[in-house]
């Protein structure tokens, strides 16, 4: 471990921490925590359950920010103490351990600085992510399932919870479509630029001649809207259909029509939910998803947004892709919007999406979802 490098890193990170403390305004955060705790102590606080839960989420968020700053400050103090000891009595192992602490601090500050770019109205919310197999037949359906695994791994690696709302299995392999909820702070902000067409090139495991196959899958991402947010949708604007939930066949097929699909006639938006046990629960879930889509359209106030967030049939094909995943004849994942790329395809498929997500946020990418989904 080079002492000069350690001192440089410590100085840089101390300055960055000071900037973070100024931006977050520690005295104001502490005052906010005190106000919220006093509010929560009121006898009638829980009379309105939804309002109380919202305030408790705000309190948890303030506490988390203060704890994060305290942890970062502790890391800097530990590094400074280590430096003083090292200059009195050099110990390479001690310095190496302190450098690891600074590396973790750098990662934390990098993440915080990135989250400052997530300033959209719904960036802090959870995400609803839908995957649709596109052109490519069975390979495309297999590709859709691979993407489901990739996003699930990414979410779990970031401490987020994944719940399947709807899943339609492929005839031979993979899935035709799937909708998942990703619950976690800034889930929508991180994932929103994943919207678009994802292209796979590989030797097809479903081709007896081992030919190279190109397959496509479409991704759409919506924020998970708070239940208290409501939109009045006239019943005449909705077309509700039901069907049986279940897999490819056998004793586990649901013989009751519990799956629900809702079409919003004026916009053509469609949502489907199959995972709940009752038709009523699936209808409530589908309505929540539809409202999220309509709310985003209303917030953007652009008719073109309808094409960006179209329903559950996605045309994912040549010329529309935002990212290529090449398994053969070479290995590379490349984002066509940011030029971010890596040769470690397996790591990406195991959920290592942060370099691509970070690049899209830092470069202010406008995800071309309309091209992918129209």
Swiss-Prot record:
Alphabetized InterPro entries for the sequence: PCRF (IPR005139), Pep_chain_release_fac_I (IPR000352), Pep_chain_release_fac_I_sf (IPR045853), PrfB (IPR004374)
GO terms for MF: translation release factor activity, codon specific
Keyword Thylakoid: no
GO CC aspect terms: cytoplasm
Coiled coil residues, start to end: none
Keywords: Cytoplasm, Methylation, Protein biosynthesis
Location (main, coarse): cytoplasm
Modified residues annotated as N5-methylglutamine in this record: 251
Modifications made to the protein after synthesis: Methylated by PrmC. Methylation increases the termination efficiency of RF2.
Domain of life: Bacteria
Subcellular location: Cytoplasm
Function statement: Peptide chain release factor 2 directs the termination of translation in response to the peptide chain termination codons UGA and UAA.
NCBIfam families in the cross-refs: prfB (TIGR00020)
The family this protein is said to belong to: Belongs to the prokaryotic/mitochondrial release factor family.
Protein's name in the database: Peptide chain release factor 2
Organism name: Parasynechococcus marenigrum (strain WH8102)
């Amino acid at each position: 471990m080079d002492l000069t490098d350690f001192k440089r890193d410590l100085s840089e990170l101390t300055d960055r921490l000071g900037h973070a403390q100024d931006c977050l305004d520690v005295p104001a955060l502490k005052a906010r925590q005190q106000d919220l705790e006093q509010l929560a102590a009121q006898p009638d606080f829980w009379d309105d359950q939804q309002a109380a839960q919202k305030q408790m989420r705000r309190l948890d968020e303030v506490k988390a920010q203060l704890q994060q700053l305290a942890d970062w400050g502790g890391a800097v103090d530990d590094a400074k103490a280590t430096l003083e000891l090292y200059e009195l009595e050099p110990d390479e192992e001690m310095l190496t351990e302190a450098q690891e602490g600074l590396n973790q601090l750098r990662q934390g500050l990098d993440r915080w600085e990135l989250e400052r770019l997530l300033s959209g109205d719904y960036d802090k919310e959870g995400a609803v992510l839908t995957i649709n197999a596109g052109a490519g037949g069975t390979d495309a359906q297999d590709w859709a399932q691979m993407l489901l695994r990739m996003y699930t791994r990414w979410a779990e690696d970031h401490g987020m919870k994944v719940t399947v709302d709807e899943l339609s299995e492929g005839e031979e392999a993979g899935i035709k479509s799937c909708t998942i909820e990703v619950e976690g702070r800034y889930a929508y902000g991180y994932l929103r630029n994943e919207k678009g067409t994802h292209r796979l090139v590989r030797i097809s495991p479903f081709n007896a001649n081992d030919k190279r196959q190109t397959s496509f899958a479409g991704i759409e991402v919506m924020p998970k809207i708070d239940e208290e947010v409501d939109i009045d949708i006239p019943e005449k604007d909705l077309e509700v259909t039901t069907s049986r939930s279940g897999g490819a066949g056998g004793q586990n097929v649901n013989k009751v029509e519990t799956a629900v699909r809702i079409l919003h006639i004026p916009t053509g938006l469609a949502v489907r939910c199959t995972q709940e046990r009752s038709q009523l629960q699936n209808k409530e879930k589908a309505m929540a998803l539809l409202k999220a889509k309509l709310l985003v359209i209303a917030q953007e106030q652009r008719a073109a947004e309808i094409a960006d967030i179209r329903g559950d049939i996605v045309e994912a094909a040549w010329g529309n892709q935002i990212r290529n995943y090449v398994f053969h004849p070479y290995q590379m994942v490349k984002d066509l919007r940011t030029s971010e790329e890596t040769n470690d395809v397996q790591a990406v498929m195991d959920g290592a999406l942060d370099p691509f997500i970070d690049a899209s946020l830092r470069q202010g990418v406008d995800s071309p979802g309309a091209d992918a989904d129209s």
